[in-house]
From Swiss-Prot:
It catalyses: D-glycero-alpha-D-manno-heptose 1,7-bisphosphate + H2O = D-glycero-alpha-D-manno-heptose 1-phosphate + phosphate. One of its GO terms (cellular component) is cytoplasm. This is D-glycero-alpha-D-manno-heptose-1,7-bisphosphate 7-phosphatase. InterPro entries: HAD-like_sf, HAD-SF_hydro_IIIA, HAD_sf, Heptose_bisP_phosphatase, Histidinol-phos. GO terms for biological process: carbohydrate metabolic process. Disulfide bonds: none annotated. Zn(2+) binds at residues 98, 100, 106, 108. Mg(2+) binds at residues 15, 17, 136. It is an enzyme of class 3 (hydrolase). The lineage of its organism: Bacteria, Bacillati, Actinomycetota, Actinomycetes, Mycobacteriales. The keyword Cytoplasm applies. The gene is gmhB. It comes from Mycobacterium tuberculosis (strain ATCC 25618 / H37Rv). The record marks 109 as: Contributes to substrate recognition.
C-alpha cells in the first residue's frame, strides 16, 4: 500500500465515530457515558501501535458548532479514551478536532485536509507518503485524496460494510480486521 522511507515515520490518521466507537444514531457522542467502543477497536489500536509510530484521531465534531456540546466536552471524551488505552499501554499521539458546523466554511472540516496537514506540518518526521487515513465515510476517503493532492500521497482504508465505490485503497469490516491484515503483512502470526 505504501513504501518505507528511511528517516521518516508512518502516520495513521483515524476517524473516531464509526471506526473506534459506535455512532449515536441521529445525535452526537456528547459525553463519555455515550461513548461505546466498537468490538475489537481498543485491541486493534494496541496492535496498530506496534507498527505505527504515530496514531492520530481526526474527527469532525459539528455538535460543538451547533451548540449541542462544548469543545471541553469533546476534550473530556478524548481524555477518557486516552486514559483507558493508556492502562493497556497504548498512546494516541493526537486528537485533531474540527468543531465547526458543516455550514461554516473552515479549512479543517473533513474532507478538507487542514487537520492532517496541520499535524504533518508540526511533525516534520511524519511523512505524507507513509500516511494512511482510516475512516467509515466518504468524507474520510476524500480526506485521504485531498491530503494526497496537497502533500504528494496518502493511502485510504475504509472501515465498515458500505461500498466506497472503489474510492478506498483497501476496505475492511472493522478496525480489528485492518489491524490483523497489517499484522499479517508484517509477518505476524495469529
Amino acid at each position: 500500500m505504501v513504501a518505507e522511507r528511511a528517516g521518516h515515520q508512518w502516520c495513521l490518521f483515524l476517524d473516531r465515530d464509526g471506526v473506534i466507537n459506535r455512532q449515536v444514531v441521529g445525535d452526537y457522542v456528547r459525553n463519555w457515558r455515550q461513548f461505546e467502543w466498537l468490538p475489537g477497536a481498543a485491541r486493534a489500536l494496541k496492535k496498530l501501535r506496534a507498527w505505527a509510530p504515530y496514531i492520530v484521531v481526526v474527527t469532525n465534531q459539528q455538535g460543538v458548532g451547533a451548540g449541542l456540546m462544548s469543545a471541553v466536552d469533546v476534550m473530556v471524551i478524548h481524555r477518557h479514551l486516552q486514559m483507558q488505552l493508556a492502562s493497556d499501554g497504548v498512546l494516541i499521539d493526537g486528537f485533531q478536532v474540527c468543531p465547526h458546523h458543516r455550514s461554516q466554511r473552515c479549512g479543517c472540516r473533513k474532507p478538507r485536509p487542514g487537520l492532517v496537514l496541520d499535524w504533518l506540518g508540526r511533525h516534520p518526521d511524519s511523512e505524507p507518503l507513509l500516511s494512511i487515513v482510516v475512516g467509515d465515510s466518504l468524507s474520510d476517503l476524500e480526506l485521504a485524496h485531498n491530503v494526497a493532492a496537497a502533500a504528494g500521497a496518502c493511502a485510504s482504508v475504509q472501515i465498515g460494510g458500505a461500498s466506497s465505490g472503489g474510492v478506498a485503497d483497501a476496505s475492511f469490516d472493522s478496525l480489528w480486521e485492518f489491524a490483523v491484515a497489517v499484522g499479517h503483512a508484517r509477518g505476524e502470526r495469529g
